[in-house]
């Protein structure tokens, strides 16, 4: 199945609408991409985004019975706030380094986050520069329980559709 992770639009109703659409399409989990609040491109396109408080995240979490993912976590404190908000899973991610220049990578912060969540029932995923199974294993050795791979699959899809994605999967 596929998880649907949406951007942190200003209006909660916009987020809930996208959750409902994803549920109807068969999503197995729903989430919010917190680091998307820093994306200037969204604002330039007239899309209102904003950071969310723990109370706002709790309210959004109540809108679905599916597992709830929060993406864009980069500190142990943020991870603990996500736990408080009711997240089932976090994605340690710096959004490909496109939100803040000089931001550490997932591998830099994973050990501290994993330590902070030790013993908690929260899944820790990570993304960023996963180009091989070895890259995935490195992130998992640092505390992730799984990884996300996006950009190489997009390259394959743009280049040759489904066949391109299959080629990327076979190559990596």
Which residue stretches match the model-derived regions?
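N-terminal capping/small domains of soluble enzymes
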Residues: 1-10
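Short histidine
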Residues: 161-172
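Alpha/beta enzyme core
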Residues: 9-126, 133-156, 170
